[in-house]
Each structure stands twice: as C-alpha cells, then as structure tokens.
C-alpha cells in the first residue's frame, strides 16, 4: 500500500464527503456553491441519518449543500448570498435558521474537521513515558 500523502488524505476525505452528500468529489473543488438532492446511501458514514434535511460542507472553495427538495430553494438562496467562509458563522446562520424554522426545522449540529498536514507531524518518543496500570 502506498504511503499516505497530504493529497491522498484530501482525496479520501473528498470521496467520503461526496458519498455522504450525494455529489462528486470534484464538486467540493468548484469555484461556485451548489445544491444536491440528499438521498439514502449505504456507503455513507453509518451514524448519519440520511437523507438530510439540510447539510452544508465546505473544503474552502465553495459550499456543497445536500438537502431535501423541500428546502432546495431556500438553501440555495442562503449559500449564494454569502461567501463560503461566512455561511458557517453567526449572525448569518440565524438567517438560515429562521428560514428553516418556518418549515419546522432548525440549525442543529455544527462540526469542524481538520485534515492533518503530514509535513507538520513529528515523531513522538512515547517510550520516554512511564506506563502504569491503574486500578481501584
């Protein structure tokens, strides 16, 4: 198996995000934000409850929104109103929340994931630390 590289890590993350959202990995690299229809996908991360009502993901270039068709227009208007980096901030998120709340939903979970930069990782000398088994 080839060694991991920053590019391989990014490609793996893009592929999994695309599976989860129902788009193509290259959609995250486009210059424009897009909306795709959310759908059930057996290869998605198991803890996700699909289809999404609304899920926004950005790798920095744009926002890919995976939504139920009932929210497509309002989510599209939202992600095209602000630059990608501002779609995930308050007070802008309040605008999305207000629109979703009129349809019985609210903004709920926010998560940030960071990909490692392999050039910044340094070996840790774990053998220098004492190992003890703790008990009652």
Residue ranges and their predicted role:
Residues 2-4:
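Contiguous mid-protein beta-loop-alpha structural module that forms a pocket-lining wall or clamp
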Residues 6-8:
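Early transmembrane hairpin of solute transport permeases
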Residues 12-135:
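Acyl-donor-binding surface of acyltransferase catalytic domains
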């Amino acid at each position: 198996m080839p060694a991991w590289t920053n590019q391989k890590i990014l490609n793996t993350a893009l592929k999994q995000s695309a599976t989860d959202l129902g788009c193509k990995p290259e959609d995250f690299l486009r210059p424009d934000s897009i909306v795709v229809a959310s759908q059930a996908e057996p290869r998605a991360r198991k803890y996700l409850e699909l289809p999404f009502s609304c899920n926004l993901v950005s790798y920095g270039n744009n926002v890919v929104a995976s939504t139920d068709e009932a929210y497509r227009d309002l989510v599209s208007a939202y992600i095209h109103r602000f630059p990608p980096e501002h779609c995930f901030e308050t007070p802008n998120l309040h605008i999305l929340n207000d629109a979703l709340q009129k349809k019985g939903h609210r903004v709920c979970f926010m998560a940030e994931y960071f990909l490692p930069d392999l050039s910044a990782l340094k070996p840790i000398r774990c053998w220098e630390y004492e190992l003890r088994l703790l008990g009652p």
